[in-house]
Amino acid sequence: MNSYPKFAEIKGIKYEINTDFRVALECNEIANNSEIKDEERSLAIIYLLFGEQGLNDYENWNSLLRIAIKFLSCGKEIEDEYDNEEKEENMDYQQDWGYIRTSFFSEYAIDLDKEKMHWWRFYELSCGLSEKCILSRVRFIRDFDISQIKDSAEREKWIKQKEMVALKQTKNEKSSEEKRLDELFEKQLRRWVNWAKQMDI
């Protein structure tokens, strides 16, 4: 059985982590909201994951941010370099929530509206969804390259399908959304760390 982290420790101080997958998804939204200042985003994520204890412990903000990134990236270490190749996104947790919820119920008999679940388990299960589920089918349609279709009627059919499931364009939308969550948060961390250095944290 997998052992998922529930606490973090810095200099002998123990912090309880809010491990609920809904909180992690909220952190993802905040990290991708360019209308919020970097320092406000970082503090919001510290508060969501570590509560008042983390928010009040300003001397350890930098360390808490690094732990937050590692937690949100499901334990993967932060690397100095990453693949910054931009890809067209094919999923958005907020816009696709209905597809995600339906897919979890059909594949795992899990009702996400009622289930309490650790973020890491949610992420692992979402990665394990089969090609048959509605979310996977929608993502396939979004990714499908219609340029390979020669028949005009068939091409028109695919164009309509793509329009039906297309993600809505938003101000805060990032072209790298499709990348693994750890890559997204690694990028964000670099801004937070630079801000923390300026604040001499």
PLM regions: where:
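Charged interaction scaffolds used for protein-protein
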Residues: 1-14, 21-24, 32-36, 43-201
